[in-house]
Design a protein with these regions (language model features):
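N-terminal Rossmann-like FAD-binding beta1-loop-alpha1 element of flavoenzymes
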Residues: 2-29
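C-terminal lid/capping helical subdomain adjacent to the catalytic/cofactor pocket in oxidative enzymes
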Residues: 445-552
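C-terminal segments that line or cap access tunnels to active or ligand-binding sites in enzymes
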Residues: 203-220, 263, 272-273, 278-456, ...
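Glycine-rich FAD pyrophosphate-binding loop
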Residues: 21-44
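Active-site/ligand-binding neighborhood in enzyme catalytic cores
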Residues: 128-251, 255
Length: 552
């Protein structure tokens, strides 16, 4: 069988290796740093052994390929990652500073309360959402150039508008100042309409259960590297995959037809087939070293794909010396009025009891600052220009200002508010380098934003032995996510060997049908399908009114 060289041991690279080694290929994986997992990895670097992570991520009911892969990876001798390493669904709530926290307790009926909308605002909110769901080409071309927050702004009052946009970073993963209407619509379409039935076995937390359409998201029952990537790499090594860490790709040799070799510094790497599963910023730099390669179809998309620059979402941990309880199980938070658009989760709510939180730590909250361009309340600086100390003080102040959070803490802790608990420290993911000139990460992160859809490359390139993987490539997931990464790795593997199975995203018949109608309307430059229906009803009403008046 042919030899496969994969650059990158993030989720996409590991997914491609997983599929190809099982089909008999000789697979080698090269990784720039000393551990796998990419932007989802965890680590324990401090003397207190406290776990840290790049950012916390959930897994939704439409993560079909991700869950399928997890079912194939042994966690231990008792079962798979899917069976033993996943939590039950988290309970995500919107936590404003002055109002009560609101949760998704009643399905779609909960949305007006969660986002502080009145009935008329909710109707207009759904009108915009429905337009994204019933568009195909129009959404990919036109709506991708529209900022989602700005698209909804004319239809919502200020309070509802700011509350609604606050969920974009924590849920979609792309901050509200940059995420497109297309990406936002695609995300909620899958979440609320996917045909999902992911069955889970009974465990210490209760009987067997099902994660269905619209259900809450799952987390790992421990740090991501310890509960996914380490077992996965162990499994792949047993299957024959060779891993080479701290080997960064620096150059690809191209003879005008194929890739003849690759370089990690001075070391020459050779194989029959190469898969680039590295972040697109680094890929763009490597391709620029070889203009003849950079100009190839699909590969020439990288430069415009990364033109918007890296995404800044800074993760942090709050370590407490006492256990803080919540009145609801597995409570996840969006601090909706925080300037830095903070999201939080207390890890001990879902982590196995044997997981070490760190020396003297009884409660460990993981959080993410989801927008970097809005000035904070203390220093009046955005995350982009804060020092590390200023960032930590801002995060602390914004969390302590959240009245909804403090109310729930008091409810579950005998009247004690958040300020009354001893905070040992606030830790920030170690790769972030703060500077007045601008915050930077050792590994720049890409996410979907306005005007990126047109530049997503396919997994198969015109170079017959070069393939691409990563959530920045074209997938049915359509969102930079764990599912998008797994799907892309599988699609890259399938482009090499058609025996690889990729699970498709479900599209309801009514959405598929109406989207096809809108494609016709878009071709003839007619209004969007929903707009056309509304316009027709208005004209019909006027005509009917005219007939009635004329007959009098």
């Amino acid at each position: 069988m042919k030899s496969i060289v994969i650059f990158g041991s993030g989720i996409a690279g590991l997914s491609a290796a997983h599929e190809l080694v099982q089909l008999g290929y000789t697979v080698s994986v090269y990784e720039a740093i000393d551990q796998p997992g990419g932007f989802f990895r965890s680590s324990r670097l401090g003397k207190d052994n406290m776990p840290s992570e790049y950012s916390w991520h959930g897994m939704g009911p439409w993560y079909h390929n991700a869950f399928d892969v997890m079912q194939q990876i042994p966690f231990n001798e008792k079962g798979s990652i899917y069976d033993l390493a996943l939590s039950r669904p988290v309970d995500f709530g919107i936590f404003p500073h002055t109002d009560k926290a609101q949760f998704y307790d009643e399905g779609l009926k909960s949305i007006p309360k969660m986002f502080r909308m009145n009935t008329w605002e909710f109707i207009k909110w759904f009108y915009v959402m429905l337009k994204t769901w019933t568009s195909n080409n129009r959404s990919k071309i036109d709506y991708d150039k529209l900022n989602a927050a700005q698209a909804w702004k004319p239809f919502l009052k200020d309070k509802a508008y700011k509350t609604w946009r606050s969920c974009f970073g924590p849920w979609i993963g792309s901050d509200w100042s940059k995420v497109s209407l297309h990406t936002t619509g695609a995300f909620f379409k899958k979440q609320l309409t996917t045909k999902a039935i992911h069955r889970h076995k009974a465990d210490q937390n209760g009987p067997a259960w099902t994660q269905g359409t619209g259900a809450g998201w799952l987390l790992f029952a421990g740090p991501s590297s310890e509960y996914w990537f380490n077992p996965w790499v162990t499994y792949l090594k047993e299957k024959g995959v060779r891993f080479c860490f701290e080997k960064a790709l620096t150059k690809l040799d191209f003879d005008g037809t194929t890739i003849t070799s690759a370089y990690c510094g001075e070391e020459i790497i050779q194989g029959d087939i190469y898969i680039l599963a590295i972040n697109p910023f680094i890929a763009a730099d490597i391709l620029s070293e070889t203009p003849a390669l950079e100009s190839q179809e699909e590969l020439k998309l990288f430069k415009p794909l990364v033109q918007g620059g890296p995404h800044i979402q800074v993760s942090f941990r709050l370590a407490f010396s006492e256990e803080l309880k919540f009145p609801r199980k597995r409570t996840a938070l969006v601090i909706s009025d925080s300037e830095f658009n903070l999201t939080l989760f207390a890890e001990e709510q879902v982590w196995d009891k044997e997981v070490d939180l760190g020396r003297n730590i009884k409660s460990l909250w993981t959080g993410t600052s989801c927008i970097s361009s809005v000035p904070g309340r203390i220093y009046h600086k955005p995350v982009n220009n804060c020092s590390k100390e200023e960032f930590v003080e801002e995060v602390k102040a914004q969390i302590l200002s959240c009245g909804a959070l403090d109310e729930l803490i008091k409810e579950a802790n005998h009247g004690r508010g958040l300020k009354e608990f001893s905070l040992l420290k606030i830790e920030v993911w170690h790769e972030w380098k703060f500077s007045p000139e601008g915050i930077k990460s050792l590994q720049p992160k890409w996410v979907n934003s306005t005007n990126t859809q047109a530049y997503l490359p396919a997994q198969k390139t015109p170079v017959p032995n070069l393939y691409l993987a990563g959530a920045h490539t074209r997938t049915q997931a359509e969102v930079w996510s764990i599912e998008g990464a797994v799907e892309s790795g599988r699609r890259a593997a399938k482009a090499i060997d058609d025996r690889v199975e990729v699970l498709d995203q479900y599209r309801p018949f009514w959405i598929s049908s109406l989207s096809k109608i809108d494609d016709i309307l878009y071709t003839i430059k007619a209004p969007q399908f929903i707009d056309s229906i509304v316009l027709f009803l208005i004209i019909f009403s006027l005509w009917f009114t005219y007939l009635i008046v004329s007959s009098l």
